[in-house]
Curated annotation (Swiss-Prot):
Location of region: VTT domain: 150-259
Designated name of the protein: Golgi apparatus membrane protein tvp38
InterPro entries: Golgi_membrane_TVP38/TMEM64, VTT_dom
GO cellular component: Golgi membrane
Membership in a protein family: Belongs to the TVP38/TMEM64 family.
Region of interest (Disordered), residue spans: 1-51, 368-418
Membrane topology designation: Multi-pass membrane protein
Gene that specifies this protein: tvp38
Protein's UniProt keywords contain Cell cycle: no
Gene Ontology biological process: mitotic spindle elongation; vesicle-mediated transport
Length: 418
């Protein structure tokens, strides 16, 4: 018998198909297509293909998600809302085109008077006020005024005007927006868990994250109003973050100065000098766009990381409180931060299965067939699965007779029906 098992195992281990041999030609040499590419090159090429496919997949996913959100929003609109949305889109496009045309005309109008206005303090003050007031949402033109400042006053003097008005204007806009939007902020804090999470992350990594937000290519005045809705951000912290990123404001001032040089001395400059000035403008714009895009990506990643840390801390606190059967206490002394943490705590309780009530803590009332209560007493507190010395154990007493009825806490005997 063991020999039969051994022979059977050997037979099963043999392959029924002939072994694959390397393809050869009639003279015994290997065919040309038999030679494979080196392993390292194949791995690197496959890795690059996977990365490109992953990037393409991410881009397509974002496009699909955005289009689906737009379609869903459009379907939820009624007739008049759709008309309003179409008119708003047309108006936005017209305003954008008009703004571009107006911006181009501004520098044509400034060319004859730029040299005269360069040393005029009144022009300096008026332009400073313009930069200050466009800090309030929904006004636009902040970047244009920065370029105009560089066009009229040069790089450094224009940057000084632009930076000082930006810091003070953004801080004032922040304070005013927070005052006006205070009720809206509290409603948003209590209902929107994403808003609450970002508000909580700004409390501990506020200055660094605010600087990253200020470096992002976001609409200036709208950004001032949006950040003001986060109650954990202090106005002075926001002003300090704006002051820290003021070197970024050298870009529009430098572009404005180069435009003036090209407009005034373009006829006298050689082709090489013109090319250098034009290339410097293009390179400066490209650096600004790339830096803004990179900072935007890093800002989103940092915000997600901080949100995960805050959620983990809140989750551990909830689990510890539930394990110890103690009520949840305030997460922070700051009331605004505590509101945000409470909103996240509710979301975490839903995720991990905790609720504000315990399904076992229910009061039971047993009635007989006539609808009369047969339990002579009811406890004021919730029901607990535990026995006292005055209560009887239903499993100890057995099934009992047909005339006996048991509640979970009290053994009640009924007289048999007559």
């Amino acid at each position: 018998m063991p020999a039969d098992y051994t022979s059977t195992a050997r037979a099963l281990s043999l392959s029924t198909s002939p072994p694959l041999s390397s393809p050869t030609s009639e003279d015994g040499s290997y065919l040309p297509w038999r030679h494979l590419a080196p392993t390292g090159r194949r791995d690197s090429s496959s890795r690059s293909i996977r990365e490109s496919n992953s990037l393409r997949h991410q881009v397509m996913n974002r496009i699909n998600n955005a289009s689906q959100r737009i379609i869903m929003t459009w379907r939820r609109m009624n007739f008049w809302q759709r008309i309003g949305a179409v008119l708003a889109a047309i108006l936005a496009n017209l305003l954008g085109i008009g703004f571009l045309v107006f911006t181009g005309k501004v520098f044509i109008w400034l060319k004859p008077v730029a040299e005269q206005w360069e040393h005029n303090p009144l022009v300096f003050f008026v332009l400073w006020l313009c930069v200050f007031f466009v800090s309030f949402p929904p006004l636009v033109g902040w970047s244009t005024f920065g370029t105009v400042a560089g066009y009229i006053f040069g790089v450094w003097k224009g940057w000084l005007l632009y930076a000082s008005a930006t810091v003070l204007g953004s801080t004032a806009s922040f304070i005013v927006s927070r005052t006006i939007l205070s009720k809206f902020v509290h409603r948003l804090m209590e209902r929107d868990k994403r808003f609450a999470a970002l508000a909580l992350t700004l409390k501990y990594d506020g200055l660094k994250l605010l600087c990253m937000i200020r470096l992002c290519p976001l609409p200036y005045s709208v950004c001032n109003g949006a950040v003001s809705t986060f109650p954990t951000v202090h106005p002075l912290t926001y002003g300090l973050a704006t002051a820290i990123i003021t070197p970024k404001l050298l870009v529009p001032a430098f572009i404005g100065n180069r435009l003036r040089v090209l407009s005034e001395k373009g006829g006298e400059m050689s082709a090489g000098s013109k090319a250098v000035n034009i290339c410097s403008i293009i390179i400066t714009i490209a650096i600004g766009i790339f830096t803004g895009w990179y900072i935007y990506r890093r800002t989103l990643a940092r915000a997600k990381e901080l949100e995960a840390q805050e959620r983990e801390g809140i989750r551990q606190s909830l689990e510890a409180d539930h394990a110890a059967h103690r009520p949840h206490h305030a997460f922070f002394e700051d009331p605004e931060a505590n509101i945000a943490a409470t909103t996240l705590a509710c979301d975490e309780e839903e995720r991990i299965g905790f609720h504000d009530f315990d399904d076992d803590n229910v009061d039971l009332v047993l009635d007989d067939e006539s609808g009369r209560e047969i339990s002579p007493k009811r406890t004021d507190g919730p029901y607990r699965d535990e026995f006292t010395d005055n209560d009887s154990d239903v499993f100890k007493d057995g099934d009992g007779t047909d005339g006996e009825t048991y509640t979970l806490h009290t053994h009640v005997r009924q007289n048999p029906r007559s």
